[in-house]
C-alpha cells in the first residue's frame, strides 16, 4: 500500500484604495506533497515535491472607464526520490493587461514576460525567458447580443520528472531545451433573450510548439522538445429559466493531433469523445431549497496510442458512456451562511472508463455510485 499526503499553507491579503491602486490581492503559499510506499526489494517509489510561491496582483482604474491590471508571480519547486536525486525549478513572471472600454467595443491587450531555470537530477541546467502578447475584442452589437474574438500567446516551462521514479533513473536535459509555446485563436458569441434564454458558442484553434517529451539514450533519460501539437474544437451552450425552473444543455468537442497523429501523451492533450451535458433544476423560495439533476454523455473516441501505459493495439476505441447525478442544496436560514448539500454522483452506478486518462484500453474505471452529505457554515 501507499500513503499520499498533502500539506498546504496559504496566507492571503486583499485590499484597495491605496492611491493609484484601486485593488490589491497578494498571497504567499507553501505546498508539500509526499508519497510513502511499503518497501519493496525490487524498487522504491517514495517521492516528495516541495513548492513555494507568491503572487501580487494589482488593479488601477484609468479615466473612470478603463482598467489596468498588473502584477508579479513567483514559484520554486524541489523534488526528491527517497531523499536523493534532487531536481529544482524556479519560475518568475511579470504581466500587464489593459481593459479598454470604447463602448460598444471592449478591447483587451496584454503582455507577459516569464523567466525559468531548471536543474535535473544529473545536474544538467537550462534556463530561458519568453515574451507573450495577447489581444481580445468584444463587440456588443445589441444589449442582448455580442461577438468576441481573441489571440493569445503563452509559454509553459519544462516540467520536473516524476519524483517517485527519479531514484532509479538518470535524468538529463537536452542543451537546447525550451519552454512549450502556445498560440490560441478563438471566436465566439453570447445571446440573452428577455432574461430567460441564454445562448453561447465558441470555436478555437490552438497550436503548441516545442512539446516536451522524453527519450532513453543509453543509461540516461533525456528531456527534449519533441514536436508540435495542433488542436481545434468548439463549444455550444444553452440555458432557459422560467420562474424557479432552469434547464441547461451543451456540447463540446476537440480534436488534438501531434505531428499528424492524435496525441496520447499526458504532457500534451488527451483525445476525448464529443461530450454532451444536460441539467435540470428547480429553486424553491420557501424553504430555500434547490433540487436538480445533471447528465454527462460522452461519445466513443478512436486514436493510435503512442505513450507508455497504452494498449498494444495499433488502434484503440474508448467506449462512450453516460453518467447521471442528482443533488439538493438547502439553506435553512434563507441566507448563504448555512448550507446543507446532498448529492448522489453516478446515481445508476455506471461502470465506465473516462477519456481523460492518458492510458489506452487498460486505464482504470471511475468510481461507482458516490453519495455525499456536507454542511457548511460561514461566519
Where does each model-flagged region fall?
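Outer-membrane beta-barrel proteins
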Residues: 33-39, 77-83, 118-122, 156-162, ...
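Extracellular loop and loop/strand-boundary signature of outer-membrane beta-barrel proteins
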Residues: 1, 38-46, 57, 79-86, ...
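Face-selective signature of the C-terminal outer-membrane beta-barrel domain
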Residues: 4-148, 152, 197-203, 241, ...
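Outer-membrane beta-barrel signature, preferentially recognizing the C-terminal barrel domain
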Residues: 1-18, 47, 125-126, 132, ...
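Conserved C-terminal beta-signal and adjacent last beta-strands/turns
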Residues: 149, 243, 268-379
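Residues on the lipid-exposed face of transmembrane beta-strands in outer-membrane beta-barrel proteins
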Residues: 11-15, 54-60, 94-100, 135-139, ...
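Outer-membrane beta-barrel pore domains and translocons
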Residues: 27-33, 73-77, 112-116, 152-154, ...
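Gram-negative outer-membrane beta-barrel transporters
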Residues: 64, 107, 199-207, 224-307, ...
Amino acid at each position: 500500500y501507499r500513503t499520499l499526503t498533502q500539506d498546504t499553507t496559504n496566507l492571503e491579503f486583499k485590499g484597495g484604495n491605496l492611491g493609484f491602486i484601486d485593488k490589491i490581492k497578494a498571497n504567499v503559499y507553501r505546498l508539500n506533497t509526499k508519497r510513502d510506499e511499503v518497501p519493496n526489494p525490487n524498487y522504491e517509489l517514495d517521492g516528495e515535491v516541495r513548492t513555494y510561491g507568491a503572487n501580487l496582483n494589482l488593479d488601477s482604474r484609468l479615466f473612470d472607464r478603463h482598467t489596468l491590471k498588473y502584477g508579479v508571480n513567483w514559484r520554486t519547486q524541489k523534488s526528491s526520490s527517497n531523499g536523493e536525486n534532487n531536481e529544482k525549478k524556479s519560475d518568475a513572471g511579470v504581466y500587464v493587461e489593459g481593459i479598454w472600454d470604447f463602448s460598444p467595443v471592449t478591447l483587451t491587450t496584454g503582455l507577459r514576460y516569464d523567466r525559468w531555470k531548471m536543474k535535473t537530477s544529473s545536474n544538467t541546467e537550462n534556463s530561458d525567458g519568453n515574451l507573450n502578447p495577447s489581444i481580445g475584442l468584444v463587440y456588443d452589437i445589441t444589449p442582448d447580443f455580442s461577438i468576441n474574438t481573441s489571440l493569445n500567446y503563452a509559454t509553459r516551462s519544462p516540467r520536473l520528472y516524476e519524483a517517485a521514479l527519479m531514484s532509479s533513473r538518470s535524468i538529463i536535459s537536452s542543451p537546447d531545451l525550451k519552454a512549450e509555446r502556445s498560440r490560441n485563436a478563438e471566436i465566439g458569441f453570447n445571446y440573452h433573450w428577455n432574461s430567460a434564454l441564454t445562448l453561447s458558442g465558441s470555436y478555437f484553434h490552438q497550436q503548441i510548439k516545442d512539446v516536451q517529451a522524453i527519450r532513453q539514450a543509453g543509461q540516461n533519460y533525456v528531456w527534449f522538445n519533441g514536436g508540435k501539437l495542433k488542436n481545434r474544437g468548439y463549444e455550444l451552450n444553452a440555458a432557459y429559466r422560467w420562474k424557479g425552473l432552469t434547464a441547461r444543455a451543451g456540447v463540446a468537442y476537440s480534436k488534438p493531433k501531434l505531428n499528424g497523429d492524435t496525441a496520447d501523451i499526458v504532457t500534451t492533450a488527451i483525445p476525448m469523445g464529443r461530450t454532451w451535458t444536460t441539467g435540470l433544476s428547480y429553486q424553491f423560495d420557501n424553504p430555500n431549497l434547490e433540487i436538480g439533476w445533471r447528465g454527462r454523455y460522452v461519445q466513443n473516441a478512436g486514436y493510435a496510442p503512442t505513450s507508455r501505459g497504452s494498449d498494444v493495439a495499433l488502434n484503440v476505441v474508448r467506449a462512450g458512456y453516460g453518467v447521471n447525478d442528482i443533488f439538493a442544496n438547502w439553506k435553512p436560514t434563507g441566507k448563504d451562511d448555512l448550507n446543507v448539500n446532498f448529492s448522489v454522483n453516478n446515481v445508476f452506478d455506471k461502470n465506465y472508463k473516462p477519456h481523460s486518462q492518458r492510458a489506452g484500453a487498460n486505464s482504470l474505471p471511475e468510481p461507482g455510485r458516490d453519495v455525499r452529505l456536507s454542511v457548511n457554515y460561514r461566519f
